[in-house]
Regions:
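Alpha/beta enzyme core
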Residues: 4-213, 222-237
């Protein structure tokens, strides 16, 4: 959904052939991808030709950037039934946990995921945190293991089959910011400063890996420790 989240020009002007949705799907096929995730419009425009060649995942909501002044909210652009009708096997959505809009987003996506499961579709949640208060004393706790872990836990509560989460880079967000509830054992026994342990806690809060976890982001270069050893060896802890 880069064309919505970052604008079509910003996303595709460097490689104009990707203004054509067919080329996005062709790239996924050539790259051996196991699915292609995009918007209702992108996938719907080429579904007759490609839906039987590679699994489609329709992203249901987006944060569009044409609103001025800029705001951060996930708005539903598509329904589960629209995704199903074009031949998609999965739907995805983003919730900005911690934001003022989170409660509404939770209700919307919980309802959408319930419908998707009625139709036998897979559900994927981008369980991202967003609140300016999550930055304190120069530290960005949007990537704290305890807070992202709770985002994961909320996501699996509405039956996300797969959670997409930013890689944890620090910990102790609850206590440093001074809100919510936690337990000393989270920091003394269940985690350490090691990147793999931070990822393990994200897996633990995803029902001990019963829901799959995909990490994105993390520190650049060698600091990502091979993406925290491929998300703690593909969620086997």
């Amino acid at each position: 959904d880069q064309g919505i989240e970052h604008s079509a020009g910003a996303s595709f002007a460097p490689n104009p052939l990707y203004f054509d949705p067919a080329n996005i799907v062709e790239l996924a096929l050539a790259g051996g991808c196991n699915a292609v995730a995009s918007t209702l419009g992108v996938l719907g425009s080429v579904s007759r030709k490609y839906a039987h060649k590679i699994p489609f995942l329709v992203k249901l909501n987006h944060n569009e950037t044409l609103t001025y002044p800029a705001m951060y909210d996930q708005t539903l652009f598509a329904s589960v039934d629209q995704a199903f009708d074009l031949g998609a096997v999965a739907v995805g959505a983003t919730i900005y946990f911690g934001s003022p809009e989170a409660r509404r987003q939770i209700m919307e996506i919980s309802e959408a995921f319930a419908r998707a499961h009625e139709l036998g579709m897979v559900t994927v949640l981008w369980a991202y945190l967003r609140n300016p208060g999550f930055k304190k004393d120069g530290v960005d706790y949007h990537v704290s293991a305890d807070l992202t872990g709770q985002g994961n836990h909320l996501g699996v509560t509405i039956e996300a089959d797969i959670i997409k989460q930013k890689m944890a880079e620090n910990n102790d967000g609850y206590r440093k910011i001074g809100f919510g509830n936690t337990n000393k054992k989270v920091y003394d026994e269940l985690t350490s400063d090691h990147p793999i342990d931070l990822v393990r806690y994200q897996v633990v809060t995803s029902y001990m890996g019963r829901a799959g976890l995909i990490n994105s982001g993390g520190a650049s270069g060698q600091n990502d420790f091979a993406e925290a050893v491929r998300t703690a060896v593909i969620n086997k802890r």
